[in-house]
Amino acid sequence: MEALGPGGDRASPASSTSSLDLWHLSMRADSAYSSFSAASGGPEPRTQSPGTDLLPYLDWDYVRVVWGGPGPAPPDAALCTSPRPRPAVAARSGPQPTEVPGTPGPLNRQATPLLYALAAEAEAAAQAAEPPSPPASRAAYRQRLQGAQRRVLRETSFQRKELRMSLPARLRPTVPARPPATHPRSASLSHPGGEGEPARSRAPAPGTAGRGPLANQQRKWCFSEPGKLDRVGRGGGPARECLGEACSSSGLPGPEPLEFQHPALAKFEDHEVGWLPETQPQGSMNLDSGSLKLGDAFRPASRSRSASGEVLGSWGGSGGTIPIVQAVPQGAETPRPLFQTKLSRFLPQKEAAVMYPAELPQSSPADSEQRVSETCIVPAWLPSLPDEVFLEEAPLVRMRSPPDPHASQGPPASVHASDQPYGTGLGQRTGQVTVPTEYPLHECPGTAGADDCWQGVNGSVGISRPTSHTPTGTANDNIPTIDPTGLTTNPPTAAESDLLKPVPADALGLSGNDTPGPSHNTALARGTGQPGSRPTWPSQCLEELVQELARLDPSLCDPLASQPSPEPPLGLLDGLIPLAEVRAAMRPACGEAGEEAASTFEPGSYQFSFTQLLPAPREETRLENPATHPVLDQPCGQGLPAPNNSIQGKKVELAARLQKMLQDLHTEQERLQGEAQAWARRQAALEAAVRQACAPQELERFSRFMADLERVLGLLLLLGSRLARVRRALARAASDSDPDEQASLLQRLRLLQRQEEDAKELKEHVARRERAVREVLVRALPVEELRVYCALLAGKAAVLAQQRNLDERIRLLQDQLDAIRDDLGHHAPSPSPARPPGTCPPVQPPFPLLLT
């Protein structure tokens, strides 16, 4: 049995049998069975050699074990004439040749069962002593493959320690290399003392970009805090604290890290940015990603803020007003303003000549009447504005003139708002436009009964009151018509007159004789929120206080000059709900309040100019502690005492007045919430009537439409307020801010205009659903219920629009109050405004809260 033991070598089945030692074993096995062969009377028939066809469980491993062995071959094995085993192909094909009896042959289970069993035992022993099996080698292969994968991932994964997004070389755009020339730094506008900063000698090497706290802060803003993307590329603090100061604090092009030029940084959150020309300061430009208010810790006192909260170019200093100067490298052509460069291709020649005159006339009568203080106002057009969407008026580009060093330092002759209520005193003005008793209604596609339903709603909600629209000009036809959403066009035609919104008479900021008084101080645009519009502070005393503070502390000029539109942005609702119906729904509450206080304002129309928010001049300046602020008890018309001549005293007085105005705005907000609850009860009653008159499927369609209508109205109003905010900021930043901010505002405007196109499709879809619901209600409900339905749609839109506008006013007023408190040193967050006694906190409104 030693010959059947496992061998050290693995022989091929087709190899020679010279090393096999089965001679004696085969002879003994054959002799043991020879008796059976002899008894049969004939020679034993030869069977076919074992193969996979006859014995599929036999493979060549078995043959290797049976024919293999460690023992040396006998000397006469080479002379043996026994045939060698054939390959697998030969074993499977054809009959085998006859072999000489007595020689060892292939094993057969039927012929030699004992030898077959012994060979099986030898095979089992050989398998037990074999090296590692194939599964072990497969596991080793998997380990090697995993190691290779780890190496590949380590080479191609995102390097978080660098915090930089890299693009492949084939996709990376080539950035033009800037010459490493020394750029002299002029006096920084953010440092009124005029201290120059040392010039940097060369641009940073490509491999060393992004080192230091500046790049780390930038990466933190870009990747960790996307909401602070507005600060990338703009100044707003000391040197190396804000990114704009690292390159240039006053518009100077200078060396900057490589991250500023990296395209992936500018494309963060799908915000694609086109880089500015080489003669203008380069930097990252971003879009609005939510809140536009920057942290107060990064806003110095000498920086200005626009209406939307962005940091504007510094133009004020301790020595007075500093004109904006853009330095240009030697040999480079003096660049035009970015606003002119960007918009010149959108403007006709006539409007471009008006927007960019060669020299502003200083002695013309029209200029002297339009000019307030040192502010020059010229009309402008916005880029790529769809005429079929906005039938409003173009913004006014305010161009500041250098301050007059010989200007009088005394109290200025201010131009204040008229104390006449809205709708009174307009009959004496030329160019008055009066709408007849019944409003012209929009014709919506639908059934005849549906159109009659819209026209019949006038008798149920009280639209029969006459309305006076704002005249297109003053007695001298010098002041253009102001529209609250921020656009100016030519005088409207008769077909477009119903789309224009009424504006209060005092929004023009004229006194009783319609003649603006001369002033040598910078006038603040208040009231309508339009850039360059006349100030409409509640009283002359408050206006003089604001102008005096703006003269003493120019850093407060822009925060106090910002003002949202006095009327909700209803332009995007046109086509969904008739605007005349929406405005009429604002008027019933206006009539009730007007009977009580006819000389103040109309809250329902929501076109108040803060006149109603303050009591008499003596009462509005009174505080709880007269000893602490004794100056506030003095009448506004008299001169201020000596303690209040300081800047701090004036700021305290203005903060007290703004706090009172904020409390009154919260009171108005509670009134709107009560009105919203009343409309919700009307909707529930109407839904009960629809449940009784219509099928369950139609009732479900009506309920879904009313819920979707509130959401769509909120989105449209939010988009309209953002568009108006960006246009106001763009008009204010047209001439006195850096090009980076202007480009950012233009980009944001284009993004909002694309969203406006999407909103138009959504509005058309909801309008189709409204027409389908109205057709069902016309067949099922009586005329009175149809009027209630039409009034409900207009009332919901009116309440939502007023809530949106009131939120804008409260937020802006709170920002102004925070800015004054920061200057006073109160860095702690301001507490919630105190509410009048007997009032409770506002409850959850029945309408969904509008997005901010």
Curated annotation (Swiss-Prot):
Biased composition (Pro residues): 830-852
PROSITE patterns assigned to the protein according to its UniProt record, in alphabetical order: ASD1, ASD2
Biased composition (Basic and acidic residues): 152-164
Domain ASD1: 145-233
Region (Disordered): 34-54, 81-109, 125-218, 276-320, 399-431, 464-496, 823-852
Modified residues (Phosphoserine): S18, S133, S137, S166, S190, S224
GO molecular function: actin filament binding; myosin II binding
Biological process per Gene Ontology, one example term: actin filament bundle assembly
Biased composition (Polar residues): 279-289, 465-479
GO cellular component: adherens junction; apical junction complex; apical plasma membrane; cortical actin cytoskeleton; microtubule
Record carries keyword Phosphoprotein: yes
Coiled coil: none
Location of the ASD2 domain: 543-825
Compartment list: Cytoplasm, Cytoskeleton
Low complexity composition bias: residue spans: 125-144, 301-313
Modified residues (N-acetylmethionine): M1
Family: Belongs to the shroom family.
Function: May be involved in the assembly of microtubule arrays during cell elongation.
The record's note on its domains: The ASD1 domain mediates F-actin binding.
Protein name: Protein Shroom1
Species the sequence originates in: Homo sapiens (Human)
